[in-house]
Regions:
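Helix-loop-helix units of permease transmembrane domains in multi-pass membrane transporters
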Residues: 75-107
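Membrane-interfacial segments
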Residues: 37, 41, 77-80, 84, ...
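Cytoplasmic juxtamembrane interface segments
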Residues: 1-10, 76-89, 143-166
Length: 242
């Protein structure tokens, strides 16, 4: 019921067209990059997918995170407009369920986005690296990994958007967090590994093992629990609707 209600509300906004445009822009980047600098990439002694991800994933991840920011702001802009969220609090609805319906809807919106992006990476692999192994298993694994890495960002961004009646404040906060992630995600510091907005910049390679990924997923799970618990506490103790 709550999930269907969220979809119905978002149909009145530009939410779904925005995600389609974002997916197409993110997918266009590796094609243009490969076409413009083909010789730089095809001669590298790496697997095709690793070459493509090293060259393009930072931009693709940036666009994906920006879609999270835009999507979160759109979801709560509709709630705060004309005090709609206050009316929701008067209805016999579970507010925890409403929030997590938004989380899962935003996460589900990235399934077709990542499918388009991975399909384009597959096309680039076949077109420019036809003589090398395609690594379909790693491609599919990376799609699932990328979707998982977006979940803490979605939770945090929806939490921020739910606290800001002015959409431009939550949008600005999200952009600041995104730009700060861009300054640290390439470093080997602990902050780069645990910072929520830098997680989507990471991707799987053939060298990734469960032992190497275990610390990352421990932080990932901790952030999910932290942001989810923070929202539940706000709903319980805050007097104004969130």
């Amino acid at each position: 019921m709550s999930f269907a209600l969220e979809i119905k509300k978002l149909k009145r906004t530009g939410f779904f067209p925005a995600f389609l445009i974002g997916a197409l822009l993110a997918s266009l980047f590796p094609v243009v990059n490969m076409a413009a600098r083909q010789e730089m990439f095809v001669n590298q002694p790496l697997a095709p997918l690793e070459i493509l991800l090293n060259a393009n994933w930072s931009m693709m991840a940036t666009l994906n995170v920006f879609l999270v920011i835009i999507g979160s702001c759109m979801m709560y802009y509709g709630e705060f407009a004309n005090r709609a969220i206050e009316k929701l609090h008067m209805l016999p609805l579970n507010l925890h369920v409403l929030f997590f319906s938004k989380v899962f809807l935003l996460l589900a919106a990235f399934i077709p986005v990542l499918a388009i992006e991975e399909a384009v990476l597959l096309f680039c692999s076949k077109h420019w690296f036809s003589e090398k192994e395609l690594q379909l298993d790693l491609l599919l694994g990376n799609a699932g990994f990328s979707l998982a890495m977006l979940l803490p960002v979605i939770l945090l961004m929806l939490l921020i958007a739910s606290l800001c009646k002015n959409m431009w404040i939550s949008l600005g906060a999200g952009v600041i967090l995104l730009f700060s992630a861009q300054t640290i995600y390439r470093s080997d510091s602990i902050l780069a590994k645990i910072y929520t907005f830098s997680m989507p910049y990471q991707f799987l390679t053939k060298d990734c093992t469960p032992e190497k990924l275990a610390p990352l997923f421990l932080v990932w799970a901790g952030e999910i629990l932290l942001f989810g618990a923070a929202k539940m506490m706000l709903i319980k103790f805050r007097r104004t609707p969130v």
